Swiss-Prot record:
EC number: 1.14.-.-
Alphabetized InterPro entries for the sequence: Rhodanese-like_dom, Rhodanese-like_dom_sf, TrhO, TRHO_N
Protein name: tRNA uridine(34) hydroxylase
Residue ranges annotated for the Rhodanese domain, each copy included: 128-222
Superkingdom field: Bacteria
Gene transcribed to yield this protein: trhO
Catalytically driven reaction(s): uridine(34) in tRNA + AH2 + O2 = 5-hydroxyuridine(34) in tRNA + A + H2O
Function: Catalyzes oxygen-dependent 5-hydroxyuridine (ho5U) modification at position 34 in tRNAs.
């Protein structure tokens, strides 16, 4: 049976998380769905997988709440269930930046659709002639799997380091059109809002992130694959599982070449961690 994998988020003010959390958990468990839903005062972030009918039924139920009526999840298919359990968690933020919380009622950051971004990249500038800077907001190990051509990345280990990195490089963004991007849109939206707040003049988020770009225009101007946070590890521009795997001892990304090493034992070790504390604890 084919499994439908969806991811979606929305920055929207939520003041009834104590009611939403058990209701969502009950609905998902009854439908046989697995994955994670994060709820915070600033919104919702979810990754779910299950049969088509179960996914569609849950989304119909979710859309009945006016706050979530416009959520359009990104989809991919797999032969296996990528998640082991169903979790619904209450958090301070749906994506941790450790900065003042996003205020959903004040609106989202400007966005650029994948087809429009491809046109900008094809022509070498935006529609007003400004150079376009692709700014990767993801962690360093994700960037290593693949990113846009000539993208700027700040070698951060976690998203909460992004504000400090932007502050150090803000002058380099002056006079340019900055397009922040990430896997599915949530980090680049929050990053774009933060950059606006600190005075970066012309900033957009890539609508739907890399996965939506793959879905709508393919891999043009992109090199490599896109890291995803489930057993598939990486998807290619056709949204198919790619070669890299993740070591579940140290969380490093293991390339197809590294998987040939005798040090690579699924779930136990890889060339990055063999003999380390991470490997010993696995």
């Amino acid at each position: 049976m084919q499994i439908v994998n969806i991811s979606a988020y929305k920055f929207v003010s939520l003041d009834d998380i104590e009611t939403l959390r058990p209701a969502m958990r009950e609905r998902c468990e009854a439908a046989g769905l697995k994955g994670t839903i994060l709820l915070a005062p600033e919104g919702i972030n979810m990754f779910l997988a299950g049969p088509r009918a179960a996914i569609d039924g849950f989304m119909d139920w979710l859309h009945a709440d006016a706050r979530f009526a416009d959520i359009a999840p990104k989809e991919s298919l797999s032969e296996n269930q990528p998640f082991k359990r169903m979790l619904v968690r209450a958090k301070k933020e749906i994506i941790t930046m450790k900065m003042p919380l996003i205020r959903p009622e004040e609106g989202r950051a400007p966005s650029v659709r994948p087809a429009e971004l491809k046109r900008w990249l094809d022509q070498g500038h935006d529609d007003e002639g400004r150079p376009v800077v692709m700014l990767d907001t993801r962690n360093d190990f994700e960037v290593a799997v693949g990113t846009f051509e000539d993208a700027v990345e700040y070698d951060i280990a976690k998203f909460s380091e992004f504000p400090e990195a932007v502050a150090a490089h803000k002058a380099e963004l002056e006079g340019k059109t900055v397009v922040s991007f990430c896997t599915g849109g949530i980090r680049c939206e929050k990053a774009a809002i933060h950059m606006q707040e600190v005075g970066v003049e012309r900033v957009y988020q890539l609508e739907g992130g890399i996965l939506k770009y793959f879905e709508e225009v393919g891999g043009s101007h992109y090199r490599g694959d896109c890291f995803v946070f489930d057993y598939r590890t990486a998807l290619n521009p056709n949204l198919e599982p790619a070669g890299p795997k993740q070591c579940f001892a140290c969380r490093a990304v293991v390339t197809p070449q590294e998987q040939q090493s005798p040090h690579y034992v699924v779930g136990k070790s890889c060339p990055h961690c063999i003999g380390s504390k991470d490997q010993a604890a696995a």
